[in-house]
Design a protein with these regions (language model features):
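Loop/turn residues immediately N-terminal
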Residues: 106-108, 177
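Beta-rich, blade/repeat-based domains predominating
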Residues: 8-31, 35, 70-99, 128-143, ...
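Beta-propeller fold detector
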Residues: 1-6, 58-69, 120-126, 170-174, ...
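Short, conserved, GDST-rich strand-edge loop motifs in beta-rich repeat architectures
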Residues: 33-50, 145-157, 192-208, 247-258
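A short loop-to-beta-strand structural motif that recurs across blades of beta-propeller domains
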Residues: 49-52, 108-111, 158-161, 210-213, ...
């Protein structure tokens, strides 16, 4: 579809984590992406993290400059010890013609109008929640926002918040760990992707600890799939199955990333 987009990599001491395109979303038949690894603070002078449109010939067109927006619209409670000026954008969804993107490092959800490039803040998560590292965004009548949390991993410290269109946050479900994805099925059941569920820092000890938790409308949680390693995203396909990007980071050797299909149990 498109290549040659900016990407960056952390040092080996931090795990050689690569940031490129953080997420994609469709408005009708038009594909959009959000960059996560661009900007001077990622080591790429002369670039910015943007929302871009993918053209039919494989080229891309900038729609909105997210780096510029967050530098001029600071959140209430940034974490000075863990601050990324350009942000590291993670999730993006399309709702009624607009795009909504999550920035975990600052802690915010922003609305982008793909027709005009206008950016506005839906919610400053840091203002009420502090530095919880929001990552996963899904829309199911309202927005639902999951968080990664801080390292070292503390089991049960993550949650999913309900976010209404006016920007108000309410706790939806808790006692989760390192949430990196949220999806819904046709029965109003939520599926939460936990990337790691062992205490400590990302490393060999976390291999195989990723899992998918189903949250029923009554709040009951059930693990429906386990044995995943550093999964990074989840979606439901047209066949009703879950699709998870497994080994999205942190694998023992490069090139092990895969998409796995999970049949939803009745």
């Amino acid at each position: 579809m498109a290549d040659g987009l900016p990407s960056s990599e952390t040092s080996a001491a931090l795990g050689n984590l690569v940031s490129g395109v953080g997420a994609v979303a469709f408005v009708g038949e038009q594909l959009y992406g959000v960059e996560a690894g661009a900007g001077c603070s990622h080591g790429l002078a002369g670039t910015d993290n943007t929302v871009f449109r993918v053209n039919s010939d494989g080229t891309t067109t900038e729609v909105a400059d997210l780096s510029a927006f967050i530098k001029t619209h600071p959140v209430a409670n940034p974490n000075a010890d863990d601050f990324e000026p350009d942000g590291t954008w993670y999730s993006m969804v399309a709702v009624r013609g607009d795009l909504y993107a999550v920035e975990p490092n600052h802690g915010e959800v922003d609305r982008i109008d793909p027709r005009t490039g206008a950016i506005s803040r839906l919610v400053d998560v840091s203002a009420s929640q502090g530095h919880i590292v929001p990552t996963a965004l899904a829309y199911h009548g309202n927005f639902f926002l999951g968080n990664l949390g801080l390292f070292p991993v503390k089991v049960g410290s993550a949650k999913v918040l309900k976010l209404n269109p006016s920007g108000a946050l309410h706790l939806w479900t808790s006692d989760l760990t390192t949430v990196l994805g949220v999806a819904f099925d046709g029965h109003d059941r939520m599926y939460v992707l936990e990337s790691m569920t062992a205490s400590g820092f990302p490393g060999p000890g976390e291999l195989g600890t990723g899992q998918v938790v189903r949250v029923d409308p009554n709040g009951q949680q059930t693990v429906i799939a386990g044995g995943l390693s550093f999964p990074t995203a989840i979606t439901i396909g047209p066949d009703g199955a879950l699709y998870v990007s497994n080994l999205g980071f942190g694998g023992p050797i490069p090139g092990l990333g895969e998409i796995v299909r999970i049949t939803i149990p009745g």
